[in-house]
Design a protein with these regions (language model features):
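Short hydrophobic segments within beta-strands
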Residues: 517-519
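Catalytic-core signal marking the mid-to-C-terminal active-site face
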Residues: 2, 36, 349, 355-513, ...
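Ordered, soluble secondary-structure elements with a strong preference for glycine-centered loop motifs
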Residues: 94, 263-264, 340-341, 528-532
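A general structural motif
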Residues: 309-310, 548-554
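Active-site capping/gating regions of soluble enzymes
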Residues: 250-444, 597, 619-628
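Short, hydrophobic/aliphatic alpha-helical segments
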Residues: 25-30, 305-315, 457-463
Length: 645
C-alpha cells in the first residue's frame, strides 16, 4: 500500500455491542463475564472501559484543583519535585555516614535510614548527621521520643522533612493500643518539635503495617482517614486546632503488585482526604499534605530474588503515577541476608530511571483521563469512604482495634491472598511457579541485637534532661504503655512457600536427597504436558524429579521404580493411558513396593477413581490443588524416613 493510500484509510466506528459480539466469538461460547476480574476490594474490573463509565464521575479537569484527585499541584513534579528517600541500612553510624554521602552523590535528595539499626547512635553522632542540608524522611517507630529529644538538643535550625511515628499502627503491631500516658508523652514531644522545627512533619500516618497484614486498598485508605480523625480529635482535646494538627501530618503508604489499583488508591486517597479536610473547615495549602510511599515488602520473595527488581520497579512506577512526594524502593534481596551493594544500587536507581529516562516527572498526572483509572479511582473512593464511615460509627480506629474486628478483617483478606497463591489462581514467579531448584539460599539478616532501656518517664522534659553527648537512642528508649489487643501481624505473601523450600534445604543438610520419580505412560508427546506440570509443582517445594523413559507396559514402570527406589512417585500420562493401564498398574506398584507413595497427575472420572484408590492410589496432583498442603505432606516423606541417597 502506497503512502497516499495509507493516509486515505480510516477506521470504522465500532459500537459496544459489536465489540461484545466479537469478543464473545473469540471466547468460543463462554460468557463475556470470563473477562471480568474480581479484586480483593470486592470490585469488578471490566475488560473495556468507555467514556460512558465516567458519566457519574464528578472530577476536576486539572491537577492542583480540589478535590486534588489529579494531584495537589498544577505543575505536578515540576512544581513539587519528587524526593527519592532510599532507606539506608548500616551496621554503624560511621558506615551510615559514608552511605549517606555516597547516596547524595548518586542522586538521592532526601536522607532516610533504618533507625532500628541505629539504636546505638549517640547524641554526638546524631548531631553530625544533621549537618546535611537535605530533608529527612525517617519513620522513627519505637524511637520517636528518644530521637526527637536528640533533635531538640541539637543545633539544626534548618531541619525539614519528615521525622515522626505513627503511634497507633506501631503499637498495633506489638499488640497494644496506646494509653493516656503514651499519648500524653507523644503530644509533649509533638508540641516541642512544632515550636522548634515548624518545617518538620512529626505525625506519620503509616498504613504499611496494615498493608503487610493483608489489607486491601479500601481498607488502607479508610484506616488512613480514621487515624487522621483520631489524631485531630485527640489533639483538639489538648487545645490544638484541626489546622495545627494537619500541618504536622505525613501519610505513608506501600504500593503493591496490583498496578492500576495502587495508582487509583493514591488518587482516591487525595480525593477523600480533601473531603475530610472540608469537614474540619481546612482549605488551601494546608490540604496539600505530604504523601510518601515505599515499594511493598509484602510482595517480595527470597526465592528467585532478582524477580523482585521487576516487582519493585512496577510498584515504584505506580507510586509516581499516583503522585507521591517521597519514594522509597526496597532492595531486591532485602530478605536474603545482608543487602548487597548491587541491590542497594538498583533500589536507588529505579526512581532515577523513572525520572530521567521515562520522564515521569515531566508529565503532570499521566493517569488522568484514562477511562479505566478514573472509573476505578471513583469506585475505590466511594467504597473507602463507606468503610471509613463504618469504622467511625463503630467508635473509631481504637475501638475496632480493641474489639479485634479490624484484625479479623485483615486476616480474612490475607488468608484469601495466600489461598489464591497456593492454588495458583495468582502467580508469583520463582515462588509458586517456575521455581529454581539450583538457587542459593541465604539466612535472613538479623542485625545486631540492641537491648533497649525501656525506661519509664513521667514527662517528656524529664527525657530531654537525660540527653548527653554519649547517650544512645537505646538508653533513652521509653517503655511502651498501652492496652493489650490482638496484634496486627505482618507477613510476606511468599513466606509459606519459602518455608517449604527451607524445609527442603534442612532435609538435604541432613544428608538426604529429595528426589521423586515420574512414571510416564505412553509416548513423550502424550505424557509431557502433565509431567512438566508435576515437575513444576514439585520444584516449588524443593523436590527434584527423575523422569522415566516411555513406559508402554506395567513391567517397564515396575522396573523404573525398582531401579530408583524413591519414596514418592507420580504417574503421568493422558487419560486414555490411565484407562489402558488401569488400576492393575497401581496394584502391581504397591505389591512390589508397599511403602512408596504414588499419586496420579490429573483427575480420574468418578467411576475409575474408586478402583484406583482401592488398588492403592494415594492421591493426585492437579491444577487448582492447594500446593502448600500437598507439598507439605510430601516433604514429610523425607523428613520421617529413609530416602534415596
Amino acid at each position: 500500500m502506497k503512502m497516499e493510500e495509507m493516509k486515505a484509510q480510516s477506521f470504522d466506528h465500532v459500537s459496544l455491542e459489536e465489540w461484545k459480539k466479537t469478543a464473545e466469538a473469540s471466547l468460543k461460547g463462554k460468557s463475556l463475564d470470563k473477562l471480568h476480574t474480581e479484586t480483593y476490594e470486592q470490585l469488578t474490573l471490566k475488560p473495556l472501559y468507555l467514556k460512558a463509565d465516567l458519566e457519574h464521575v464528578e472530577e476536576e479537569q486539572f491537577p492542583g484543583v480540589p478535590a486534588y484527585t489529579r494531584g495537589f499541584y498544577k505543575g505536578g513534579y515540576v512544581e513539587q519535585p519528587l524526593k527519592t528517600a532510599h532507606r539506608l541500612q548500616a551496621h554503624s553510624t560511621t558506615d551510615l555516614q559514608a552511605k549517606l554521602s555516597a547516596a547524595i552523590e548518586a542522586g538521592q535528595d532526601a536522607l532516610s535510614f533504618s533507625i532500628e539499626e541505629q539504636a546505638r547512635m549517640t547524641f554526638r553522632e546524631c548531631s553530625e548527621l544533621l549537618a546535611s542540608p537535605y530533608p529527612l524522611y525517617i519513620n522513627t517507630k519505637a524511637h520517636f521520643l528518644a530521637f526527637s529529644a536528640f533533635l531538640l538538643k541539637a543545633d539544626a535550625a534548618e531541619l525539614q522533612g519528615v521525622v515522626g511515628t505513627d503511634l497507633l499502627s506501631h503499637f498495633a503491631t506489638k499488640g497494644l493500643v496506646p494509653d493516656e500516658q503514651a499519648l500524653a508523652l507523644h503530644v509533649e514531644a509533638l508540641t516541642e518539635m512544632k515550636q522548634r522545627y515548624p518545617k518538620v512533619k512529626t505525625i506519620v500516618i503509616d498504613t504499611v503495617p496494615y498493608h503487610l497484614a493483608g489489607a486491601n486498598a479500601i481498607q488502607e485508605i479508610a484506616i488512613a482517614l480514621s487515624e487522621a480523625v483520631f489524631y485531630i480529635e485527640y489533639l483538639k482535646e489538648k487545645g490544638w486546632t484541626p489546622l495545627e494538627a494537619v500541618q504536622l501530618f505525613s501519610f505513608h503508604f506501600a504500593t503493591g503488585s496490583q498496578f492500576f489499583m495502587e495508582v487509583a488508591k493514591l488518587r482516591a486517597f487525595r480525593k477523600l482526604w480533601t473531603a475530610l479536610c472540608e469537614s474540619y473547615e481546612i482549605e488551601g495549602e494546608a490540604v496539600k499534605v505530604t504523601i510518601g510511599a515505599e515499594t511493598s515488602e509484602f510482595t517480595l520473595s527470597k526465592l528467585d530474588r532478582h524477580v523482585n527488581i521487576l516487582r519493585t520497579g512496577s510498584e515504584a512506577f505506580a507510586a509516581m503515577l499516583g503522585g507521591v512526594e517521597y519514594l522509597q524502593v526496597t532492595p531486591f534481596d532485602q530478605f536474603n541476608g545482608t543487602t548487597s551493594a548491587l541491590a542497594e544500587r538498583v533500589a536507588k536507581n529505579i526512581p532515577l530511571i523513572l525520572q530521567s529516562e521515562s520522564h515521569l516527572t515531566k508529565v503532570v498526572d499521566p493517569a488522568g483521563g484514562s477511562y479505566f483509572i478514573e472509573s476505578l479511582t471513583n469506585e475505590l473512593a466511594q467504597a473507602a469512604w463507606e468503610k471509613f464511615l463504618q469504622i467511625e460509627e463503630s467508635g473509631g480506629l481504637l475501638s475496632v482495634l480493641k474489639a479485634g474486628t479490624l484484625q479479623q478483617e485483615l486476616a480474612q483478606v490475607l488468608e484469601q491472598r495466600i489461598v489464591d497463591l497456593a492454588v495458583r489462581k495468582k502467580s508469583m514467579i520463582g515462588t509458586n511457579i517456575y521455581a529454581d531448584l539450583n538457587e542459593t539460599f541465604f539466612s535472613e539478616y538479623e542485625g545486631m541485637e540492641v537491648l533497649l532501656a525501656d525506661r519509664p518517664v513521667s514527662s517528656y522534659k524529664e527525657l530531654l534532661n537525660q540527653v548527653s553527648e554519649e547517650r544512645t537512642l537505646a538508653e533513652l528508649h521509653v517503655r511502651d504503655s498501652g492496652e493489650p489487643v490482638i496484634p496486627v501481624k505482618s507477613q510476606r505473601l511468599a513466606e509459606p512457600f519459602e518455608q517449604l523450600r527451607e524445609r527442603a534445604v534442612g532435609i538435604q543438610a541432613s544428608g538426604k536427597t529429595i528426589e521423586a520419580g515420574l512414571i510416564c505412560l505412553g509416548k513423550l508427546k502424550d505424557f509431557k504436558p502433565r509431567a512438566d506440570y508435576v515437575t513444576g509443582v514439585l520444584s516449588t517445594g524443593g523436590i527434584s524429579v527423575q523422569v522415566s523413559n516411555e513406559c508402554h507396559s506395567v513391567e517397564e514402570a515396575l522396573q523404573f521404580v525398582q531401579n530408583t527406589q524413591f519414596p514418592y512417585y507420580c504417574i503421568c500420562g493422558k487419560d486414555e493411558a490411565y484407562t489402558e493401564f488401569g488400576p492393575n498398574l497401581m496394584a502391581e506398584l504397591k505389591q512390589g513396593q508397599p511403602a512408596i507413595q504414588v499419586d496420579l497427575a490429573g483427575k480420574l472420572p468418578e467411576g475409575e477413581q474408586a478402583e484406583w484408590l482401592a488398588a492403592g492410589l494415594d492421591g493426585h496432583v492437579f491444577a487448582g490443588q492447594n500446593l502448600l498442603d500437598k507439598l507439605s505432606s510430601l516433604l514429610a516423606l523425607w523428613e520421617g524416613g529413609a530416602t534415596h541417597e
